[in-house]
Design a protein with these regions (language model features):
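Conserved HGGG/HGGXW glycine-rich cap/lid loop of the alpha/beta-hydrolase fold
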Residues: 15-69
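Flexible "cap/lid" loop of the alpha/beta hydrolase fold
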Residues: 107-115, 120-154
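Catalytic nucleophile serine of serine hydrolases
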Residues: 70, 103, 127
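Structural signature of beta-strand start/N-cap positions in the alpha/beta core
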Residues: 29, 56-58, 93-98, 119-122
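Active-site loop/oxyanion-hole signature of alpha/beta-hydrolase fold enzymes
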Residues: 14-15, 51, 61-100
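N-terminal cap/lid segment of alpha/beta-hydrolase-fold proteins
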Residues: 1-18
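Conserved catalytic-core motifs of eukaryotic protein kinase domains, centered on the activation segment
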Residues: 42-45, 70-76, 134-137
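Conserved alpha/beta-hydrolase "nucleophile elbow" surrounding the catalytic nucleophile
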Residues: 34-36, 97, 101-106
Length: 157
């Protein structure tokens, strides 16, 4: 199975620009949603895992608009990314899929699951969502961190 950059790279035109992605493997669909940051892309986030995932799933590494090699669009990156996931699924005829979201991709995955629950079979987030323990009133989060730091254990993780 060819899981190289050039061997997996695909693209298609939408009414909001060209979306690019990487595709590999057979099996149920798995959409991998990347994080944000300078130079980030689906390929950079997941290239090390693609070969293993592709043995069990039909993998899609979507490059969100304005990231990787996809065309930029106007609007907030998380909002445009979430709508691009649905456009992507519609264009490829994917009724529903498992999703893994890293960082911003986790937030995008949660947004997609909340807006279109029938389109998301399963969702795994990696550092993507959760309560902010450092809010203006962080008592509970601070208490949990202090308890863990005082006597770290597997159970307290």
């Amino acid at each position: 199975m060819d899981v190289t950059y050039d061997g997996t790279k695909r693209e298609f035109a939408t009414d909001r620009g060209t979306l690019r992605y990487h595709e590999a493997g057979d099996g149920p669909p798995l959409i991998l949603l990347h994080g944000s940051g300078i130079g980030v892309s689906g390929w950079r986030n997941y290239r090390g895992n693609l070969e293993v995932f592709a043995k069990h799933f039909h993998c899609y590494l979507l490059e969100f608009p304005g990231f990787g090699v996809s065309d930029p669009v106007d609007g907030h990156p998380v909002i445009t990314a979430a709508s691009s996931v649905i456009r992507f699924m519609d264009a490829l005829g994917i009724e529903s899929a498992a999703m893994i979201g890293n960082s911003m991709g986790g937030v995008v995955g949660v947004n997609v699951a909340m807006r279109f629950p029938d389109r998301v079979r399963r969702l795994v987030t990696i550092g993507g969502v959760g309560p902010n323990i450092f809010s203006q009133n962080p008592r509970e989060g601070t208490r949990l961190l202090q308890e863990f730091a005082h006597a770290p254990s597997r159970e307290k993780l």
